[in-house]
């Protein structure tokens, strides 16, 4: 546990259907093995389940556990059923499809939460196609009533869209349905914020512009001034011909002096003019201009948004070269925030 990295763990039903074979390996090739107890759930075609407990001892790379029932075609494995295991749980293709399809029907919140993490990690490791993942998650998301799991799933879906997929149309439709129909007001608000961040179609952007302009939030969705401010940044980037008007209008709406100064600092980062954005970036390389670190991070994030990543490529090297000075002059956590602002919105 004190070494970097984590084990890659895979549980498969044996060819004769009589046992569960679980193996672990060190993906970094150092031959390390992890001692831990793991839980797997074998799901049978008739809906019956079997909880299989596996204990890895020192120097143990694999384990074979006999099943109480004969596994047949249609059985699948849910790994890390209790959520306590440490590692990347690699899924077979059939198990990944089955786990995705069973998310809405899974009643156990711990198991559901563990599956969300496992499925997302398999997406990141390219063992699940992004299209398959998104399709299944959009079927599941409106059924989730647990606020923590809903929030996690919403973040995973947003990342899947930003990193792997070009067309957000179906995601826009599902999110807007949640914004307007979800029973929980917090879910409506969370869905709206994700909708705002991924909206790309002319219809979606136009809808956001209209509600921002009229300051009229969707029914049952209470938006704060910060929500409208964030929306103005997104709209200025999406609608460059209206960017100056949007920024000027939002600046005039803000009455709090501190928030007004914050907006004046950050808003040039969404300018449609490259020379203005270059000037903002150059100013961020000066330590004095990073004194309010959240403002600096927000400006850098806007400069490196996905829609402008071709122009933003030139910021990456000098921003990384500034890290040593940032470590010396900033808060202990600011280097992490700086790198996240620089890279997290690029694909």
Predicted regions and their residues:
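Polar, glycine-rich mid-to-C-terminal structural blocks
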Residues: 19-47
């Amino acid at each position: 546990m004190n070494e970097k990295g984590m084990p890659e763990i895979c549980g498969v039903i044996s060819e004769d259907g009589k046992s569960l074979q679980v193996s672990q390996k060190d993906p970094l090739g150092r031959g390390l093995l992890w001692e831990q107890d793991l839980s797997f759930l074998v799901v049978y075609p008739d809906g019956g389940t079997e909880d299989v407990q596996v204990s890895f001892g020192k120097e143990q790379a694999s384990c074979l556990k006999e099943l109480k029932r004969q596994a047949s075609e249609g059985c699948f494995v849910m790994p890390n059923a209790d959520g306590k295991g440490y590692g990347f749980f690699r899924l077979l293709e059939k198990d990944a499809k089955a786990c995705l399809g069973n998310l809405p029907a899974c009643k156990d919140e711990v198991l559901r939460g563990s599956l969300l993490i496992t499925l997302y990690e398999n997406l990141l490791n390219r063992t699940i196609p992004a299209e398959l993942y998104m399709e299944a998650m959009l079927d599941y998301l409106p059924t989730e009533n647990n606020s923590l799991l809903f929030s996690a799933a919403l973040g995973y879906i947003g990342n899947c869209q930003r990193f792997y997929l070009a067309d957000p149309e179906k995601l826009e439709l599902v999110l807007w349905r949640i914004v307007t129909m979800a029973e929980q007001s917090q879910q409506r608000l969370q869905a709206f914020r994700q909708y705002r961040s991924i909206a790309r179609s002319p219809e979606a952007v136009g809808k956001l512009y209209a509600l921002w302009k009229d300051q009229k939030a969707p029914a049952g969705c209470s938006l704060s001034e910060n929500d409208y401010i964030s929306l103005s940044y997104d709209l200025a980037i999406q609608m460059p011909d209206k960017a100056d008007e949007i920024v000027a209008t939002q600046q005039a709406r803000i009455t709090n002096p501190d928030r007004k100064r914050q907006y004046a600092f950050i808003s040039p980062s969404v300018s449609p003019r490259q020379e203005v954005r270059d000037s903002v970036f150059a100013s961020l390389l000066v330590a004095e201009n990073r004194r309010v670190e959240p403002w600096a991070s927000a400006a850098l994030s806007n400069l490196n948004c996905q829609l402008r990543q071709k122009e933003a490529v030139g910021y990456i090297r000098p921003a990384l070269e500034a890290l040593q000075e940032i470590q010396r002059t900033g808060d202990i956590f600011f280097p992490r925030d700086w790198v996240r602002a620089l890279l997290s919105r690029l694909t």
